[in-house]
């Protein structure tokens, strides 16, 4: 059975709680990604995630300065999965929470991120990823303040 650690992106950009929204935006631009995990000061423990949408809605659109703390814009306690999670478990979480990406951890330490794109590239999971995308795209059931 394929585990998420076999499909995730392990070499990823991340922010720490000491970063500001400008630094997050630059890292996202440089990596060409729409979201970036946020780790604690230890540089390992996942504490949040920030998306390009978060930066707009919680920063730019309300005229916050670029020096705004990343912790003011991020989603705290994001949905995440352990490395040994199954593809079905991740697809279920993506569909039920309307997420296109989920941080991957091992004992709460960030080890990677898995995206719907990662799952669609695998022959074993392509069809199921398409089904999850359909579920994600059907309406927007996100809670206010839950933007990734």
Curated annotation (Swiss-Prot):
The keyword Repeat applies. Keywords: CBS domain, Repeat. It comes from the Bacteria. Coiled coil: none annotated. Residues 139-148 have a biased composition (Basic and acidic residues). Disulfide bonds: none annotated. CDD domains: CBS_pair_HRP1_like. Pfam families: CBS (PF00571). Residues 8-68, 74-130 form the CBS domain. The lineage of its organism: Bacteria, Bacillati, Bacillota, Bacilli, Bacillales. Gene3D superfamilies: CBS-domain (3.10.580.10). This is Uncharacterized protein YlbB.
